[in-house]
Amino acid sequence: MADRSILTREIIVGGRPMILETGRLANQASGAVFVRYGDTAVLVTATVAPTVRAGIDFFPLTVDYEERFYAVGKIPGGFIKRESRPSEKAILSGRLIDRPIRPLFPKEMRNEVQVIATILSVDQDNAPEIAAMVGASAALHISEIPLKFPIGGVIVGRVDGRFVINPVLAQAEKSDMHLVVAGTKDAVMMVEAGAKEVPEEVILEAISFGHETVKEIVAFIERYREEALEMGLAKEKMVIEVAEPDPVLVEAVTGPATEKLDGVLRRCVNERLSKQERDSLLNNIKDELMQKFLADYPEQESLIKDLLDSIEKKLVRRMITEEGLRIDGRALNEVRPISVEVGVLPRPHGSGLFTRGQTQILSVVTLGTVSEEQILDGLGVEESKRFMHHYNFPPYSTGETRPLRSPGRREIGHGALAERALAAVIPGEEEFPYTIRIVSEALESNGSTSMGSVCGSTLALMDAGVPISAPVAGVAMGLIKEGDNFTVLTDIQGFEDHLGDMDFKVAGTAKGITALQMDIKIPGITREVFEKALAQAYEGRMHILNKMLEVLPAPRPELSPHAPRIIHITIDPDKIRDVIGPGGKVIKKIVEETGAEIDIEDDGRVFIAAVDQEKGRKAQEIIETLTKEVQTGEIYTGRVTRITDFGCFVEIIPGVLGMQGKEGLVHISQLAHHRVNRVEDVVKEGDVILVKVTGYDSQGRLKLSKKEATPPPESTAMKEGRAHRPSRRRESAR
């Protein structure tokens, strides 16, 4: 360790120092950077395989985000007591790093690259995912891996109308947006946001604001590499060899293939063929061309296939940019035909079927109790989540077969995006004390199933009677960029996503944006593109919202008869033990008697859930009886339970579920306004009488008075009045 060179440099980000260090840790990796941001510490390594992975036609990049519970001083729960599969947060953070760097590698690269971000220490004010993103960029930049440009990334919040870079926890809780911006020094590469109905122009300003800090981070990383090179801590970039295709073959294929494919593509446009019809037609013509060219070039199958795909891509892009023609015949800003249905399933609490072109989503809502909230056991602040959205993408949605496995990164990412889009309109617990779970099933997929899930989920929520503050819709925007010219497409389908340069998903209400996610395949986009895309997305979103509201203009006024009815009451926290009882005996009796489900919070909030509302009311009455406070000075109607020589015991709050109620003693002197010799002369066991609470004795027992609860007879009152009048004899004696 002593003879190792170590490079440590610091940059101020969001008013706090971010420190990068290399040379001390993980020196066998291609590049390794230790990032310290406050008390958050992340080790990011980048490693490349020395040889090309054979038999693939894509870039094999993997980004792993590894959480360690020791980072927050915790031991993992469960029997095994060690970290296992990555959490949802870890998967989303890995995707957050992957998306801005992937377009910056040479498109010909086939060497495996693995980036691993290991979270070593976490405070709650400095986001580890941002430290990991900056660390990944720096580790790649000092390595031999040929990343074209380094990137930077920040979170932009808005507190009291002012933008904040990388807000701390207290600021984040007040912010109306959580926007992640990543990019190079020249352009934005990735945007992801959750927001509370923020207008488009504010989002644009936030992106520009964040990009200014991103530029500073990129310049810092570039200087860091220069210093690392001087110290022998950085490596010269590897060269990716690109085999030039045989020009004779290219010429032989290009002319005939262009003519044939152009004719087929124009037929697709003119006849507005479906996805299956178009794919079949294109595959047949490609197979025909392939057989023709293979006869002359039998060893060039892979190259011929690449040439045909390239020609197809160029033709489609040219038709869009030069002629304004889309493959399905739509206008550039036209949304596919929309079909909307609600209440399609009889037993679930709410359901919506949203179809847009050949993309179809079935969203289903389930309402549960507070105890069914999801407990988030991760590296952040311990909390629970009462609103969840899950997304499923079965193989039949694209007419394919494949093994069914647990949700992958794509499913988790799509589910989280739709969840962010809807979170801003979900009612608070005080207004709607339910746990809400939505599952969106992608029944058909031809582009933007995540935005279809937003629309389907909104319909399902309204069908379930959830009082959302506003309906939400989403649309995916595309981009075709040729030189300085660009064309923005509304509601892209799968074919356009595959051949285009951008997938920009925008969700929101009529008032503003609730979620954004942008992925691109080119080295960044400009503010002009953002402005055009957001303006066009607003038009598309409003069109979709209007179609949805034609079917169901507002949330249903009543819940489904199959949904639990939840009653919310608040009791004195000191009375919780009375409801629970020794060993849970009392609350178990209440549940057995009523069939209701009862959740009690430490602050005294009680949630009573029952499908039968009468059973819920019965449980409420029992709990209110158990926790009812006896007020001194108040008059109660009670039943005489026992008689003794010195008085009688009166139950003023009846017992429930066979348990004793609240009773007190009426002393013999407090039974009547006249002298009482025998208690039985005034009351008998079982009598119902009025009593007044006069206080508590030294042992905390209730003291009651029948005398003070009833007016005295007139004759007694007169006697008592004379008895209290001072005598003349005493007066004269004074």
Swiss-Prot record:
Gene (UniProt): pnp
UniProt keyword annotation of Metal-binding present: yes
EC number: 2.7.7.8
The organism's taxonomic lineage, starting at the top: Bacteria, Bacillati, Bacillota, Clostridia, Eubacteriales
Cofactors required: Mg(2+)
Domain named S1 motif: residues: 633-707
Domain KH, chain residue ranges per copy: 564-623
InterPro entries, sorted: ExoRNase_PH_dom1 (IPR001247), ExoRNase_PH_dom2 (IPR015847), ExoRNase_PH_dom2_sf (IPR036345), KH_dom (IPR004087), KH_dom_type_1 (IPR004088), KH_dom_type_1_sf (IPR036612), NA-bd_OB-fold (IPR012340), PNPase (IPR012162)
NCBIfam families associated with the record: polynuc_phos, PRK11824.1
Pfam families the UniProt entry points to: KH_1 (PF00013), PNPase (PF03726), RNase_PH (PF01138), RNase_PH_C (PF03725), S1 (PF00575)
Name under which the protein is recorded: Polyribonucleotide nucleotidyltransferase
GO annotations of cellular component type: cytosol
HAMAP family: PNPase
Molecular function GO labels: 3'-5'-RNA exonuclease activity; magnesium ion binding; polyribonucleotide nucleotidyltransferase activity; RNA binding
GO biological process: mRNA catabolic process; RNA processing
Annotated organism of origin: Pelotomaculum thermopropionicum (strain DSM 13744 / JCM 10971 / SI)
Similarity-based family: Belongs to the polyribonucleotide nucleotidyltransferase family.
